[in-house]
Amino acid sequence: MEKMLLKSTTRHVRIFTAEVVNNDLKYHPNKLTLDLDPDNEFIWNEESLKKVNQKFTELVEERAGKSLDDYELRKIGSEVEGLIKYLLQNSLLSYNPECRVMNYSMGLPKTKEVL
């Protein structure tokens, strides 16, 4: 029986048991692919992207030898989502004012007027 591609989706993180081949996702039992901020809700800088990718790599390496099932994918996605919130709260990431829908999904921005 052929295995199905698994995915875990949070608001800002999508993880697939796949690799990208010619811009298509192809199932791979031992590889994960990260799709970060698919709605472009944030403005990313190189440092923030690097931190998220490093965290993702750490989380995947911690699970080496474990089954890449729905539960493990959700745990990884939740931890990456938590890092995104941390980056936003510490002004290392900002909301994108050009985003299709501005809903402040991780809380209102901190500005001098609000503080």
Curated annotation (Swiss-Prot):
Its main location: membrane. GO terms for molecular function: oxidoreductase activity, acting on NAD(P)H, quinone or similar compound as acceptor; quinone binding. The keyword Transmembrane does not apply. Its EC number is 7.1.1.-. GO terms for cellular component: plasma membrane-derived thylakoid membrane. Keywords: Membrane, NAD, NADP, Plastoquinone, Quinone, Thylakoid, Translocase, Transport. It catalyses: a plastoquinone + NADH + (n+1) H(+)(in) = a plastoquinol + NAD(+) + n H(+)(out); a plastoquinone + NADPH + (n+1) H(+)(in) = a plastoquinol + NADP(+) + n H(+)(out). It is found in: Cellular thylakoid membrane. It is a peripheral membrane protein. It is an enzyme of class 7 (translocase). The keyword Cytoplasm does not apply. NDH-1 shuttles electrons from an unknown electron donor, via FMN and iron-sulfur (Fe-S) centers, to quinones in the respiratory and/or the photosynthetic chain. The immediate electron acceptor for the enzyme in this species is believed to be plastoquinone. Couples the redox reaction to proton translocation, and thus conserves the redox energy in a proton gradient. Cyanobacterial NDH-1 also plays a role in inorganic carbon-concentration. NDH-1 can be composed of about 15 different subunits; different subcomplexes with different compositions have been identified which probably have different functions. Belongs to the complex I NdhM subunit family. PANTHER family: NAD(P)H-QUINONE OXIDOREDUCTASE SUBUNIT M, CHLOROPLASTIC. This is NAD(P)H-quinone oxidoreductase subunit M. It comes from Prochlorococcus marinus (strain MIT 9515). The lineage of its organism: Bacteria, Bacillati, Cyanobacteriota, Cyanophyceae, Synechococcales. The gene is ndhM.
